[in-house]
Amino acid sequence: MSKITTSHVRENVKELLKYSAETKKRNFLETVELQVGLKNYDPQRDKRFSGTLKLPVCPRPNMSICIFGDAFDVDRAKSCGVDAMSVDDLKKLNKNKKLIKKLSKKYNAFIASEVLIKQVPRLLGPQLSKAGKFPTPVSHNDDLYGKVTDVRSTIKFQLKKVLCLAVAVGNVEMDEDTLVNQILMSVNFLVSLLKKNWQNVGSLVIKSTMGPAFRLY
């Protein structure tokens, strides 16, 4: 049983979009984030959950992605307008932690050719996994553009040591219905991951990058 109503979410989405439309135009696309505060959860003792959800509409169309590819996928990446690195490029990093950290910070997500994915831990160590950015595999038969869109549309709820999470659920260019739907889908999915469902939810807030927070719960 959901504790938030569609109409309540819609009211807040209206306010959020109104604020964004009426304030100074930003020179970037503002992301709309769902910020979650948990309660009655002990990250030390309770199972730390992790789950991914593919949203119907991509929340961050300009999310930066890099492809670790063989020659075939490096070529395909260029035609998709996505950055790519070959095995030689990865070897040049020489397992240098600073350089790998810089790479991990530069991109929001990574995709790797299936043939390379097993080499990633050997070439780059555990850094990408620790940052929650281990590459998504892609095969030569997959549509690479579709895979990039999938990665951009997938959000991840992962409990670490602190009891708050934030995920991108949309952007301020979306229409009201789309944004409401994406928020409700994300909330329901998150609640399904929690041990005691709604009893573990302390607060739910939506916020655009530069706008104020609107409380849903």
From Swiss-Prot:
Single Gene Ontology BP annotation: translation
Database matches in InterPro entries: eL8/uL1-like, Ribosomal_uL1, Ribosomal_uL1-like, Ribosomal_uL1/biogenesis, Ribosomal_uL1_3-a/b-sand, Ribosomal_uL1_CS
Transmembrane annotation, as ranges: none
Keywords from the named record: Ribonucleoprotein, Ribosomal protein
Gene Ontology terms: cellular component: large ribosomal subunit
Alphabetized Gene3D superfamilies for the sequence: 3.30.190.20, 3.40.50.790
Sample GO molecular function, one term: RNA binding
Family to which the UniProt record says this protein belongs: Belongs to the universal ribosomal protein uL1 family.
The protein's name in its UniProt record: Large ribosomal subunit protein uL1
Lineage: Eukaryota, Fungi, Dikarya, Ascomycota, Saccharomycotina
Annotated gene: RPL10A
